[in-house]
Amino acid sequence: MKMTFRWYGENVDPIPLRYIRQIPGVEGIVWALHDIPAGECWTVERIEEVKAQAAKYNFNTDVVESVNVHEDIKLGLPSRKKYIENYKNTLKNLGRAGVKVVCYNFMPVFDWTRTDLYKPQSDGSTALFYEKAKVDNINPVKFLEQMSKQEGLLTMPGWEPERLSKIKELFEAYKEIKDDDLWENLKYFLQEIIPVAQESGIKMAIHPDDPPWSIFGLSRIITCRDNIKKFLSLVDNPSNGLTLCSGSLGSCTKNNIAAIVREFGDRIYFAHIRNIRHFKNGDFTETSHKTSDGSLDITEIVKAYHDINYKYYVRPDHGRHIWDEKCRPGYGLYDRSLGIMYIFGLWDAFEKISASKRGQYGVE
């Protein structure tokens, strides 16, 4: 596996590249041009600018997260053709710059949803939290206004001001969009962009819906093993693949993440590893990466990646906010660094076990 770390950019991310360089084993940064609105083309000049910044610290820029999909594409509007052309041109420019994987999602309106960005934990840290009853019983416009106030100055990906400013219009537009419609619009998008991605040497890696169920009446389709299989069959091409986020899919107790890794491993081009703890009422909180701290068996998930000889990209996903760090919700330096060390510790242990079985450590 190739370890990476998500970075929001110079003068934007409070974590400088020189700090990330000090985390053992990190080979690349996961990046994006967050200031460019969805639907606009990324220029070669802007892409090369980030590459140069990363190169100063010997980081690769192989993985982009995300090139956001314009809502008109998800809605299947006639204007989608313009935005798809821009998307294709962005992929061509990224391919020329050596980008290998592009993460994206097809969630209507906004990305991952939580009700509390800084929920106090028993150990004194804070973490992202999802309260089911609150989501089920609040007006989405009011909910998003409350969440924006929690963000402070560090906006979350998928909750950009230009998107939220049109929230009422978007919810109105999605009233008639059911699961089948979203599937059809996704298929159209894939049929258009996957050939371009393949020609550009890029693996497209869709991110699961977070959480993996309908919220506020909006469709969610990348939610489970069966839907992942359906997704991959829409355009059965090696350039059409997955970002497997353990925390997103793992929010649903029916999803067996390790089994999904073993079944679809050859199409998983990007892995997000994090842990969450479920509550009986449908709530969940994010935790440290340690298996015993949450409800997901991170040990077994990492073992599944090791067993399939996973060669692609990994990053620690959302961490807690610890040691009074002032950071973007879920994206602090300290707990994600601890997560990397935990993942590496598990991986190294499985490497030793495998070597022992082969007799390389004198164990017959």
Curated annotation (Swiss-Prot):
Any GO molecular function: ferrous iron binding
The organism's place on the tree of life at top rank: Bacteria
Transmembrane region(s): none
The protein, known as: Mannonate dehydratase
Entry keyword annotation includes Manganese: yes
Reactions accelerated catalytically: D-mannonate = 2-dehydro-3-deoxy-D-gluconate + H2O
Required cofactor names: Fe(2+); Mn(2+)
Pathway(s) served: Carbohydrate metabolism; pentose and glucuronate interconversion
Native organism taxonomy: Bacteria, Pseudomonadati, Elusimicrobiota, Endomicrobiia, Endomicrobiales
Biological role stated in the UniProt entry: Catalyzes the dehydration of D-mannonate.
Protein's gene: uxuA
Keywords: Iron, Lyase, Manganese
Database matches in InterPro entries: Man_deHydtase, Xyl_isomerase-like_sf
Protein family: Belongs to the mannonate dehydratase family.
EC number, UniProt record: 4.2.1.8
Source organism: Endomicrobium trichonymphae
GO BP annotation list: D-glucuronate catabolic process
Top class in the EC scheme: lyase
Matches recorded under Pfam families: UxuA
